[in-house]
C-alpha cells in the first residue's frame, strides 16, 4: 500500500496479513483523489474515514494536508495499525475504535467530507442504513459530501442524495451530497 500524493508521496506501508481488510487499490484511490483535488481546498476541510481498515484513505487525506482527519473502525488490530503507522509517519490522524453505526449516531462533530468503505458482505440494507444515518444526523455539514466505496452490484441512483457513481475495476465510488 502506498501514499499517492502530498507530503508523504510514494511512501509504502506494509500491512499485516492478519488484518480483516480489503484496502482500496492504488489505481482506484488515485482516480478518486484526482476527482476530489479539484473540489476541495485540503487545508480547509475536516474528513471522516469510516470502516477505515488499514487507514489507506486517512493517510492520503493527511498527506495532502487535510486540516482534520478522523479514522473509525471497530477492529482493534486495524485501529492499532493506523495509530502506529500515523505516529511513524508523523501524520495527525485521530483514530477511534468503535462500531461505525454507533459512532455515527453519537458523534457531535461535523465533517465536510465522509468516506466510507464498509465490508462488501454487510448487505445492501446496511449500506442504506448507513447513508440514512449520515444524512439524518449532524455528522455531515450542510454542504458536505459522502463517498461510499462498494461493489458494482449495488446501485444507489434512486437515493435522493445520490449524485453519481464511478467504476474502477471491481470498485465503485458513489457520491452523495446534502
Task: Please place each PLM-identified region on the residue numbering.
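Class I S-adenosyl-L-methionine-dependent methyltransferase catalytic core
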Residues: 1-178
Amino acid at each position: 500500500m502506498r501514499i499517492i500524493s502530498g507530503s508523504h508521496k510514494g511512501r509504502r506501508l506494509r500491512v499485516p496479513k492478519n488484518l480483516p481488510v480489503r484496502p482500496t487499490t492504488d489505481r482506484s484511490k488515485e482516480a478518486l483523489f484526482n476527482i476530489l483535488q479539484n473540489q476541495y481546498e485540503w487545508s480547509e476541510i475536516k474528513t471522516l474515514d469510516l470502516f477505515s481498515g488499514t487507514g489507506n484513505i486517512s493517510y492520503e487525506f493527511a498527506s495532502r494536508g487535510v486540516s482534520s482527519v478522523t479514522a473509525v473502525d471497530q477492529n482493534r488490530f486495524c485501529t492499532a495499525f493506523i495509530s502506529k503507522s500515523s505516529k511513524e509517519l508523523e501524520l495527525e490522524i485521530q483514530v477511534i475504535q468503535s462500531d461505525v453505526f454507533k459512532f455515527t449516531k453519537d458523534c457531535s462533530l461535523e465533517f465536510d467530507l465522509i468516506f466510507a468503505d464498509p465490508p462488501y458482505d454487510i448487505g445492501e440494507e446496511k449500506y442504506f442504513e448507513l447513508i440514512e444515518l449520515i444524512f439524518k444526523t449532524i455528522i455531515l455539514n450542510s454542504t458536505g459530501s459522502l463517498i461510499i466505496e462498494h461493489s458494482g452490484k449495488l446501485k444507489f441512483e434512486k437515493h435522493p442524495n445520490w449524485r453519481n457513481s464511478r467504476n474502477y475495476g471491481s470498485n465503485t465510488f458513489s457520491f452523495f451530497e446534502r
